Amino acid sequence: NSEEEFHLVDVSDFFSKDSPGFNAVGETEKKNYKIGSLDSKRSFIDRVKSFPRNTEITHTLTYPAAAAPRSNRSETLSFQLNHSIIALPEKPMKSRTVDHRVGWFSLEQYNYSSEALKSDNYRIASRWKLEPKDKEAYARGELVEPIQPIVFYLDPATPMKWRPYFKKGIEDWKGPFEKAGFKNAIVAKDPPTKEEDPDFSPEDVRYSVVRYVASTTRNATGPSVKDPRSGEIIESDVIWYHNHLRSYRNRYLLETGAANEKARTLNTPEEEIGEMMRRVIAHEVG
């Protein structure tokens, strides 16, 4: 629509066909399972859901597989994928080139205007956009609150007994931010109720969420969405997989059992498990 400066683009084929960058199968899987070309009749878009700053697209891709795993008698493999289309800030945050003496997460960039007759690569730091409310006080070295603090919500699926430990793990980062001049820079919140915000969703890129996933996986991860132009962290979804509890129960026994009677009991005290979770959440948030 030229009058409103909007354009309607049909991108269905990107998600329902074997498009580069949107497909599910790598060369190794193709070789191992003897995977053929995409079965377009059994590939489709499952769901599209939009929020103010992002659209989530879930789609299924199906392939014939002559050497599929033994439990698969249909000789096919289907994959369900999710892709996110995210609107970046209208004005990019000022980027910061990485100082390699400091351990930053970073994004690689390329300078094609270099006079070295080749492209030069460099890295920009991944960081939250924290701006002081009172710039003059901040310049004087006083602790000030940020205009927009970092807020992590807890997943509605998080068991009530673990929520205090998750919150403590998130807010353990208040101290380091105070060293940088910000107070209350990071806040942990319970998810809003349906009455408070009926549209709240962990998929909404406006919210950073610590997700509690019902899974047999023993792990936790801390992925984030970053603006590739500036390195600004737009949101983060820390993922805690339920069975990671067992991993830390085992580590607690092996690493402290010789000197710690609590670790040698059949049932580890709840507060001990909670403190382990707290430390993992703090690690992933960091």
List each model region and its residues:
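Auxiliary tRNA-acceptor-end handling modules of aminoacyl-tRNA synthetases
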Residues: N1-T158, P176, A180, P191-M277
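Zn2+-dependent metallopeptidase catalytic core
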Residues: A157-A185
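Active-site recognition of the HExxH zinc-binding catalytic motif
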Residues: E171-K174, G231, R279-G286
